[in-house]
Structures are given as C-alpha cells and as structure tokens.
Amino acid sequence: MEKKLLVVLFLSLCCASRLRGEAAQQWTSATATFYGGSDASGTMGGSCGYGNMYSAGYGTNTTALSSALYGDGASCGACYLVTCDASATRWCKNGTSVTVTATNYCPPNYSESGDAGGWCNPPRRHFDMSQPAWEAIAVYSSGIVPVRYARTPCRRVGGIRFGIAGHDYYELVLVTNVAGSGAVAAAWVKGSGTEWLSMSRNWGENWQSNAYLTGQALSFRVQADDGGVVTAYDVAPANWQFGSTYQSDVNFSY
C-alpha cells in the first residue's frame, strides 16, 4: 500500500509540474513565410550582425522578425518555439515544432496589404523563417501559414563570444552565442585599467564603447532581457586586435 501511495504521489507531482510548464508557456498567434533557399545560404548576414550563421553557431534554424517582434534589434539572438496552427490551415505538418533563433529583420512592405504580401507590416507578428526551419513544420507549396509561438531557452555550445571591430576610441563589440534568453539587453566592458563602462546598442547585437581600451585586457558583462547577468573576466588579452573574436568560458544556463 505504501509503495502504491508513493507511485501515485510521484505521478501527481509529475502532472503538476507538466501543467505548470504548459501554463508558463505563453503561446501567441502569428504568421510565417520562408526565404533563403533550401540550404539557408540566403539567410547569411542580416540586421543582427551575426554574419555567417554557420560559423556563428546558429545553423540553419533561423528567422527574420517583423517590426512588432524585432524591437529595433532587442530581440536579436532570442529563441522561439514555433508550431504550425493546424486548426487554421491544412498545410501544417501535424505534431511538429521547430526552435528558431532571431537573426534578421523583416521590413514592412507598405505597397502591399497585410494579407497580400505585406506580411511584415505593423502591427503583424510575423516570422520570415529559413526554408529548412519552415519545412520542419509546414508544406513547402503553402507559402504562408498561421503559427503559434512562444519564447524558449536558447541552447548554445561553449561560452559567449565577443567580436571586436572599430578603432581607437570606438570599439564595436558583436556579442554572439548567448544561451538562455539569447537576447542581450545591456552590456559593459572593463579594461584592465578602467572601471566597468556601459556600452550602447549601435545596431543589432553590436555594442559600442567610446573608451580608449587598446593595450588593456578586456572583461565583459552581459545582461539578458530576462534580467540574468554573466561576467566574463579577461576574455581578450592585452594584445587583442580589432577584427578578432574572443570566446569566454561563461554563458547563461538554460
């Protein structure tokens, strides 16, 4: 009897945990299209600044976001769980979902109406996904489908990377490979001879400092949009070079 009660209690706790997880999953309706070709080669670059998605670690499951989701770059790096809404179209691959990373911006097309080509016009919530990601959930020939989406933790391999471009008194730091929330809300840099200095978002996931940091070992602090903070000490050595990328040994949990 005692063993049966323990089994019942265990199952009850599992169910309660699952229900809490489902309740916490904030599903929102949107639409989705695709671009970039079957190998996603057409998705390289993008307004988040990641460049080559393969070498940046984002692979082919990426998406451009409409203005309503993009937030002037604030959503760069965020991960979304997307599923085709089978209750609203026959073009879904039932029972499937895909996790995509926001890497680009889908601009509005005001010459077209929102339901006839202007998919990314405000206030529409729209995902213009890579073709491989799209075909994980929908039939190729459908063109556009209704979807449901939710933010989901990003899983990354290794630490956060910091690519340094610019010149003296103008450091432009590209922050990539961010796990957890994935989206950076604030960033700081510290030279071995300075205090912590706040950086500002220049564009996408490029963060700007106007300090003179040449010849100093650099540490970085990153705050995600969920409030989490990680600090990467002495990521770049004192002889760091513009045009180089430095990988830390820290990242957010997921």
Swiss-Prot record:
The record's listing under SMART domains reads:
DPBB_1
Its keywords, alphabetically, are:
Cell wall, Cell wall biogenesis/degradation, Disulfide bond, Glycoprotein, Membrane, Secreted, Signal
State the name under which the record lists this protein.
Answer: Expansin-A9
- Expansin-like CBD domain span: 169-248
Tissue expression: Expressed in roots.
Q: According to the record, which residues are glycosylated?
A: 61, 94, 109, 251
Does the keyword Secreted belong to this entry? yes
The record lists its disulfide bonds as 48-76, 79-154, 84-92
Listed GO biological process terms: plant-type cell wall loosening
> What is the annotated signal peptide range for this record?
1-21
User: Where does the UniProt annotation locate this protein?
Assistant: Secreted, Cell wall; Membrane
Bilayer topology term: Peripheral membrane protein
Q: What is the lineage of its organism?
A: Eukaryota, Viridiplantae, Streptophyta, Embryophyta, Tracheophyta
The record's SUPFAM superfamilies line, in alphabetical order, gives: Barwin-like endoglucanases, PHL pollen allergen
Question: Which coarse location class describes where this protein primarily resides?
Answer: secreted
Q: Which family does it belong to?
A: Belongs to the expansin family. Expansin A subfamily.
Domain of life per record: Eukaryota
The keyword Cell wall biogenesis/degradation is annotated on this UniProt entry: yes
According to the entry, every stretch annotated as the Expansin-like EG45 domain falls at 45-159
What's one GO-annotated cellular component? membrane
Function as written in the Swiss-Prot or TrEMBL entry: May cause loosening and extension of plant cell walls by disrupting non-covalent bonding between cellulose microfibrils and matrix glucans. No enzymatic activity has been found. May be required for rapid internodal elongation in deepwater rice during submergence.
